[in-house]
């Protein structure tokens, strides 16, 4: 079986990766970046096959956009690898050190997790981001992308693995599962002892499948039913700009807004302005009964709309009585990703920050900033929506764990 063979190679490579010096890792990342640029034509030809097949199957435009590569996106992947090379290596850091009364020095040292399995869908850039971040954090990585992007992923992964190996990275540190059979994923999720952690990136069904079926520990990522609450005191121009950015800039990503909640006190004045602007960008509005009464041209929202991550130019809109109803709605329907309030009321802003139980909570800013690069972490491997180990954008530190190191001078326990 392909996945078992590659997992064994990865496990062997991970032991060597754990003690690799920072200079070697950084040199490999730079060479990997250069290799992507030098082989851009090869990547684009492979990607063209995937895009043509996606269009033949009539996939949504937003999904084709996530799949599609061009020279600009390849350059961005290369820049991401170079940025990771410039980041501080967390491996070996002593985070805390204390001395016990008996003279023992006890410290917490950052160490690699080991072998990380990535299961993801359409975006080929994840192949480069995941390989680079796992490498810098001293981990081996097994990549399993979606069948939609198989040609692109094979091209990118082979280029990266070859460049890394030539730079002194152990063979088997970067591997792609080329078999698109779902049984390979099922086997991958059961490889306890060979794979230390699985990180799924994709839609609801993929993440749900991994969480429910993996016996290997999982970090839940991604699904983003994100909300923006426009409070009664909000600056209308600011609110409009934030909502348009959060919905229109890249609707097919997990930090795009899916539901806007509007305070009843401003609904009649604000909604027509917002709907007009969004409609000019091709956004379909699905509104509650009161929204539809104020803006008759919008579609009627159903219960399902409040719980849907559209990943498309569709937005659910609901008028709420006050901040209490907004918080209640978010608590019921949020996936714990990113939520924002637009307000000039300090008390409401602070209450929103404290009350909303999501990985990223904003005041007067777009949810689109929930991103490793925007947070200053460099490329991210995913956005965790769980509370254990990692939460929010996962950078280098989140791809390590720690161990206790104890320095003694002959102490024995009495």
UniProtKB/Swiss-Prot annotation:
It is found in: Cytoplasm. Catalyzes the NADPH-dependent reduction of L-glutamate 5-phosphate into L-glutamate 5-semialdehyde and phosphate. The product spontaneously undergoes cyclization to form 1-pyrroline-5-carboxylate. This is Gamma-glutamyl phosphate reductase. Coiled coil: none annotated. Keywords: Amino-acid biosynthesis, Cytoplasm, NADP, Oxidoreductase, Proline biosynthesis. GO terms for molecular function: glutamate-5-semialdehyde dehydrogenase activity; NADP binding. CDD domains: ALDH_F18-19_ProA-GPR (cd07079). GO terms for biological process: L-proline biosynthetic process. It catalyses: L-glutamate 5-semialdehyde + phosphate + NADP(+) = L-glutamyl 5-phosphate + NADPH + H(+). It comes from the Bacteria. Its EC number is 1.2.1.41. Belongs to the gamma-glutamyl phosphate reductase family. Pathway: Amino-acid biosynthesis; L-proline biosynthesis; L-glutamate 5-semialdehyde from L-glutamate: step 2/2. Pfam families: Aldedh. Transmembrane segments: none annotated. GO terms for cellular component: cytoplasm.
């Amino acid at each position: 079986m392909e996945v078992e063979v590659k997992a064994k190679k990865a496990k062997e490579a991970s032991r060597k990766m754990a003690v690799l010096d920072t200079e070697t890792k950084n040199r490999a990342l730079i060479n990997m970046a250069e290799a992507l640029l030098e082989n851009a034509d090869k990547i684009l030809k492979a990607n063209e096959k995937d895009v043509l097949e996606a269009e033949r199957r009539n996939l949504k435009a937003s999904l084709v956009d996530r799949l599609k590569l061009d020279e600009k996106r390849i350059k961005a992947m290369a820049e991401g690898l170079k940025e990771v090379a410039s980041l501080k290596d967390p491996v070996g850091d002593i985070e805390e050190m204390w001395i016990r009364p008996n003279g023992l020095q006890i410290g917490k040292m950052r160490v690699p997790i080991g072998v990380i399995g990535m299961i993801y869908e359409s975006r080929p850039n994840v192949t480069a981001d995941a390989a680079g971040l796992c490498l810098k954090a001293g981990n081996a990585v097994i990549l399993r992308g979606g069948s939609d992007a198989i040609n692109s992923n094979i091209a990118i992964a082979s280029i990266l693995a070859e460049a890394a190996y030539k730079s002194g990275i152990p063979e088997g540190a970067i591997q792609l599962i080329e078999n698109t059979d779902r049984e390979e994923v099922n086997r991958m999720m059961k490889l306890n002892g060979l794979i230390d952690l699985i990180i799924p990136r994709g839609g609801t069904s993929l993440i749900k499948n991994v969480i429910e079926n993996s016996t290997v520990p999982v970090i839940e990522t991604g699904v983003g039913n994100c909300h923006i609450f426009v409070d009664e005191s909000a600056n209308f121009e600011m609110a409009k700009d934030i909502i348009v950015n959060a919905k229109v800039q890249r609707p097919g990503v997990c930090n795009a807004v899916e539901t806007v909640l509007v305070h009843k006190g401003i609904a009649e004045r604000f909604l027509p302005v917002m709907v007009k602007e969004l409609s000019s960008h091709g956004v379909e509005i699905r509104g509650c009964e009161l929204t539809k009464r104020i803006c008759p041209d919008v579609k009627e929202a159903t219960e399902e709309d409040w719980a849907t991550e559209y990943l498309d130019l569709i937005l659910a809109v609901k008028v709420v009585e006050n901040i209490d109803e907004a918080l209640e709605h978010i608590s019921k329907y949020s996936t714990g990703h990113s939520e924002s309030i637009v307000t000039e009321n300090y008390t409401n802003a602070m209450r929103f920050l404290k009350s909303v139980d999501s990985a990223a909570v904003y005041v007067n800013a777009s949810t689109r900033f929930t991103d490793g690069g925007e947070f200053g972490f460099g490329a991210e491997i995913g956005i965790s929506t769980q509370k254990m180990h990692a939460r929010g954008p996962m950078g280098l530190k989140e791809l390590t764990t720690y161990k206790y190191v104890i320095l003694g001078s002959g102490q024995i326990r009495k």
